[in-house]
From Swiss-Prot:
It comes from Aspergillus oryzae (strain ATCC 42149 / RIB 40). Coiled coil: none annotated. It catalyses: (1,4-alpha-D-galacturonosyl)n+m + H2O = (1,4-alpha-D-galacturonosyl)n + (1,4-alpha-D-galacturonosyl)m. GO terms for cellular component: extracellular region. This is Endopolygalacturonase I. It is found in: Secreted. Involved in maceration and soft-rotting of plant tissue. Hydrolyzes the 1,4-alpha glycosidic bonds of de-esterified pectate in the smooth region of the plant cell wall. Optimum pH is 5.0: Stable between pH 3.0 and 7.0. The gene is pgaI. It is an enzyme of class 3 (hydrolase). Belongs to the glycosyl hydrolase 28 family.
């Protein structure tokens, strides 16, 4: 009996002396399900978790909610309201990355950039240094779905990856319409192969979509309001200057400067090929219903097209609707021989005034 008591006491001492499991090992042992309430905690420990819940996180000023090291196959869920401290810096405020990642949100959640603190009407062209919102970079076979994002300081999503799906995303920067919001692009896509954006609902002050380079890109079922329209370009003077196999379809552009557009940089080299705009409805477009021009320089048109970025195998099919009284339904400004193999049908845009400045319109198209 005395021996048994001593044995039990010894066992108890050993148990007491054993080190407590680390926070990381606890997460792994519990099936890798983690709820975080701070950005630092999430960024440091996300790689240990298969299911990540971000609950009412207030990201400190000048810091990134960095989820780029999430483990393969992880699911990231935003709950409540995610906010960010104020600082003049380049950002991003959030970073995603990884393989087979799913990013989603709980019902009623919102990611609020509180952009009015930075808005000054200048965007990225001066004034306050403004952080970009969300980098979705180095994503492979991943999905971002159902997010509600509002009040971005400047550009919202920067997308670089392969086989990336962005589904049913709401971007509401409408507060910036009368408060100095500028350069609030919804989706900037570059250096990607396979990006599929479906069901986006966007209110902003710049491009709803801007494709700067990449291939096999689809943008379908979108509603774009208040910005600059659905764009390819400007193409040229980047590390990658090729855009091919793009489909934009079944979408509506409302109260925007432009409906659909392709713009290439004057004097640059590159290519745009295999682009289809199909079944696009335009409403109250302020400047150009359809605009395709090869004359951009220093952020604006020059009126003098160049031929270094040819636009070939373009299909414009079923683009209909209206432009404002002072707008132009269609504007085409191509270099000599640098726009070819176009298919143009079912284009019917009412209102505005026909342009007399179109140049080198390819066979089959009309201006």
């Amino acid at each position: 009996m005395h021996f048994q008591l001593l044995g039990l006491a010894a066992l108890g001492s050993l148990a007491a002396a054993a080190p407590a499991p680390s926070r990381t090992s606890e997460l792994v042992e519990r099936g890798s399900s983690c709820t975080f309430t701070s950005a630092a905690q999430a960024s440091a420990s996300a790689k240990s978790c298969s299911n990540i819940v971000l609950k009412n996180i207030a990201v400190p000023a000048g810091e990134t909610l960095d989820l780029s090291k999430a483990k393969d196959g992880a699911t990231i869920t935003f709950e409540g309201t995610t906010t960010f401290g104020y600082k003049e810096w380049k950002g991003p405020l959030i970073r995603f990355g990884g393989n087979k990642i799913t990013v989603t949100q709980a019902a009623g959640a919102v990611i609020d950039g509180q952009g009015s603190r930075w808005w000054d009407g200048k965007g990225t062209n001066g004034g306050k240094t403004k952080p970009k919102f969300i980098y979705a970079h180095k994503l492979q076979s991943s999905t971002i779905k159902g997010l509600h994002v509002k009040n971005s300081p400047v550009q919202v999503f920067s997308v670089q990856g392969n086989d990336v799906h962005l589904t049913d995303i709401t971007i509401d920067n409408s507060d910036g319409d009368n408060n100095g919001g500028h350069n609030t692009d919804a989706f900037d896509v570059s250096e990607s192969n396979g990006v599929y954006i479906t069901g986006a609902n966007v209110k902003n002050q710049d491009d709803c979509l801007a494709i700067n380079s990449g291939e096999n890109i689809e943008f379908t079922g979108a509603t774009c309001s208040g910005g600059h329209g659905i764009s390819i370009g400007s193409i040229g003077n980047r590390d990658s200057n090729t855009v091919k196999n793009v489909k934009v379809a079944d979408s509506t552009v409302v109260d925007s400067d432009n409906g659909i557009r392709i713009k290439t940089i004057s004097g640059a080299t590159g290519s745009v090929s295999g682009v289809t705009y199909e079944n696009i409805t335009l409403k109250n477009i302020k400047k150009n219903g359809i605009v395709i021009e090869q004359d951009y320089k220093n952020g604006g048109p020059t009126g003098k097209p160049t031929t270094g970025v040819p636009i070939t195998d373009l299909t414009v099919n079923g683009v209909t609707g209206s432009v404002a009284s002072k707008a132009t339904p269609v504007y085409i400004l191509c270099g000599k021989g640098s726009c070819s193999d176009w298919t143009w049908k079912g284009v019917s845009i009412s209102g505005g005034k026909k342009s007399d400045k179109c140049q080198n319109i390819p066979s089959g198209a009309s201006c």
